[in-house]
Regions:
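Aromatic- and histidine-enriched alpha-helix N-cap/loop-to-helix transition segments
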Residues: 58-59, 108, 155, 180-184
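Active-site acidic catalytic loop and adjacent metal/ATP-binding pocket
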Residues: 1, 41, 86-133, 137
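Active-site activation/catalytic loop segments of kinase-like enzymes and analogous catalytic loops
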Residues: 133-169, 183-184
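Conserved protein kinase catalytic core
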Residues: 12, 51, 110, 128-130, ...
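Contiguous beta-strand/loop segments that form the cofactor/metal-binding neighborhood of enzyme cores
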Residues: 92-95, 170-174
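An acidic site on a long C-lobe helix of protein kinase domains
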Residues: 30-34, 80, 104, 109, ...
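All-alpha amphipathic helical-bundle segments outside canonical DNA-binding/catalytic cores
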Residues: 54-55, 171-183
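ATP-binding pocket architecture of kinase catalytic cores
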Residues: 1-97
Length: 184
């Protein structure tokens, strides 16, 4: 076991990414780039790379049930969390093609330069799962840093989906993306 590192130049603080004047020119292109990057990540051959032997698989049902059980163990009911949890349990995606999922792909785990995305950081929770999780996670309100733009605070759904579809050659399922956005 081990890891390889190299020095990269860029910004990783989410609030700065959505506000920095130095990134103003690239910001409108970031959602599309993120879609392209996610399509490449999700296309990695799990068997050829051996990732199927070292990463665990989490279905949407596994993920939601585990999270729901942890929440209930606190025994501090929160009506909105209860409602969201029940909604998620009632709308679990099924029959999915699984892929490598970063699982924390968001503004704050991306390094951005004036040229675009330089790196995807923090892979410690990667697993095999529903690839739409990554697209939904970057759209979660928490990662917008006060911006009204839904994708990481810097872009539109349409741009994220277009970037993904351009590389993956498959349509993005907005319903599954919304499922994971609600989960977040």
């Amino acid at each position: 076991e081990g890891f390889i590192m190299s020095w990269l130049q860029g910004e990783a603080l989410g609030a700065r990414i959505v506000r920095s004047p130095e990134l103003a020119e690239i910001r409108p292109k970031l959602a599309y780039q993120c879609g392209q990057i996610l399509a490449r990540i999700h296309a990695i051959d799990l068997h050829a790379t051996g990732l199927d032997q070292c990463l665990h698989t989490l279905t949407p049902a596994d993920y939601v049930h585990t999270t729901w059980d942890r929440y209930k163990a606190f025994k501090t009911p929160q009506p909105m969390i209860d409602y969201a949890g029940r909604w998620l349990l009632d709308h679990l995606p099924v029959g999915l093609e699984m892929a490598l999922v970063h699982n924390d792909f968001r503004n704050g785990n991306l390094m951005i330069s004036p040229n675009g995305v330089v790196a995807v950081l923090d892979w410690e929770v990667a697993h095999i799962g529903d690839p739409m999780r990554d697209l939904g996670w970057i759209c979660t309100n928490s990662w917008r840093f006060g911006s009204a733009l839904p994708v990481g605070g810097f872009g539109a759904y349409e741009d994220l989906f277009a970037g993904y579809q351009a590389v993956a050659g498959v349509e993005v399922d907005p319903t599954r993306v919304k499922f994971w956005e609600v989960f977040g």
